[in-house]
Amino acid sequence: MRVILMTGKGGVGKTSVAAATGLRCAELGHKTLVLSTDPAHSLADSFDLELGHEPRLVKENLWGAELDALMELEGNWGAVKRYITQVLQARGLDGVQAEELAILPGMDEIFGLVRMKRHYDEADYDVLIIDSAPTGTALRLLSLPEVGGWYMRRFYKPLQGMSVALRPLVEPLFRPIAGFSLPDKEVMDAPYEFYEQIEALEKVLTDNTQTSVRLVTNPEKMVLKESLRAHAYLSLYNVSTDLVIANRILPETIDDPFFQRWKSNQQVYKQEIYDNFHPLPVKEAPLFSEEMCGLAALERLKDTLYKDEDPSQVYYKENTINIVQGSNNDYSLELYLPGIPKEQIQLNKTGDELNVRIGNHRRNLVLPQALAALSPAGAKMEDDYLKIRFAEAVKR
């Protein structure tokens, strides 16, 4: 199954682009599902029909759905949420506060992606288009298998079994003192199942032969900067971007003096889009004279963007991690981090793991054996790649 995630700053038009992309894929005979994971859904408005949690046929070969995040959250995390709520209420918090604190930031977004993984496993469609890709919080949760895998396997799994076995013996003594029960098997199983879901999801998202991100942006300073940051963070987590779409460009036919400054600024930032995202391909879409609402309007956007192309193709295979062997038994680990100054990157090697931190984003890379036995011997930024040299430690 081909998976395409549309992302971009709010208001850039990613829902319209997602819907138009779905139209073209369906037109070519691909069974296509456009799934909105944005809490503020607008996919139904874009198609101009009612959509719900389950896929609905829009036209031949095309289905649409708007994810109910609360329903997904309850199905995947309900037992843990109820238990944490019980514990917090026993400590004096009221019901609403306790329920809010029982949900980790980003979990609603991550379970939206878990829903995507379920469609992927069921293989009911040829193309799956996600409207609104993960936020930074949800992306950080994708690093859970690397950061927490060792602890989950060695500590949580044994603790899980021991807790379930001892609960009948300890519960009569524990509850009168604590004011709440010990977690039961359903509660203890949920975190590990969550970890396994994220681990499986990560494998899908980082497979650049099937999954890629489409960045939708506008030729404006703030929007462009946000898009560049998103591209860098996606690269940090090894999620490939294959296409950039510059949307809402003022047509040349507009000659009203009021828009001349806007047009001039757009030309500057449009060129920056091409320069900053090179070598990624860039497509342009104009600001239309009407809202992209309804199939007729989306057909115009579809024809402008793709003409006779198949949008399910992978436009560019972005290699975000490379390992290059040197001539002196040394290696270079190359991480694609576009637009990130070297000064903002922090590195730390512990055992066979390399910790890479950029601001609030962190990734733990498990090093292959050849690199794990060596020590970092320098780093430099070159052509948007952070190149970290590994060599044998100098003996003193």
From Swiss-Prot:
One of its GO terms (molecular function) is ATP hydrolysis activity. Keywords: Arsenical resistance, ATP-binding, Nucleotide-binding, Translocase. It holds the Pfam family ArsA_HSP20. Its EC number is 7.3.2.7. InterPro entries: Anion-transp_ATPase-like_dom, ArsA_HSP20-like, ATPase_ArsA/GET3, HSP20-like_chaperone, P-loop_NTPase. ATP binds at G8, K9, G10, G11, V12, G13, K14, T15. It catalyses: arsenite(in) + ATP + H2O = arsenite(out) + ADP + phosphate + H(+). The keyword Nucleotide-binding applies. Anion-transporting ATPase. Catalyzes the extrusion of arsenite. Belongs to the arsA ATPase family. This is Putative arsenical pump-driving ATPase. It comes from Synechocystis sp. (strain ATCC 27184 / PCC 6803 / Kazusa). The lineage of its organism: Bacteria, Bacillati, Cyanobacteriota, Cyanophyceae, Synechococcales.
